[in-house]
Amino acid sequence: MLVPKRVKHRREFRGKMRGAAKGGKEVTFGEFGLQALESSWITNRQIEAARVAMTRYMKRGGKVWIKIFPHKSYTAKGVGVRMGSGKGAPAGWVAVVKREKIMFEIGGVSEEVAREALRLASHKLPVKTKIVKREEVGGESNEG
């Protein structure tokens, strides 16, 4: 599973998820990508479940790129613990994903296989998603 090797602070503020992603909106490595349509935290377990779903469906072919990483820790207090007495212990790691961010990319397989693999992965994630195709750069242009 994905976890940071080391962090400066074990406990972080929750933060805000306002607006769309600043970068990572285009498919850069593969031919197809899975784009988030809403902002959310995605845990390292959800990322791993999506990766396993894609790679199992594709069998031995193709390549998967994971474009998000769980840098942020989240905390939780035990069940039945009263309010107060400090912040809880770190419970896991999440990736902060804003809308329009490409989370996964697939290359080296046919369009049907890529679309089905990304569809299976989308069911493992807590956000609405859409499958996007790579924009070909430097092709025919009908500008002046």
UniProtKB/Swiss-Prot annotation:
GO biological process: translation
Domain of life: Bacteria
Record's keyword annotation contains tRNA-binding: yes
GO cellular component, one term: cytosolic large ribosomal subunit
GO molecular function: rRNA binding; structural constituent of ribosome; tRNA binding
Pfam families registered for this protein in UniProt: Ribosomal_L16
Keyword Ribosomal protein: yes
Keywords noted in UniProt: Ribonucleoprotein, Ribosomal protein, RNA-binding, rRNA-binding, tRNA-binding
Subunit structure: Part of the 50S ribosomal subunit.
Function, in words: Binds 23S rRNA and is also seen to make contacts with the A and possibly P site tRNAs.
Similarity remark: Belongs to the universal ribosomal protein uL16 family.
Protein name: Large ribosomal subunit protein uL16
Species whose genome carries this gene: Latilactobacillus sakei subsp. sakei (strain 23K)
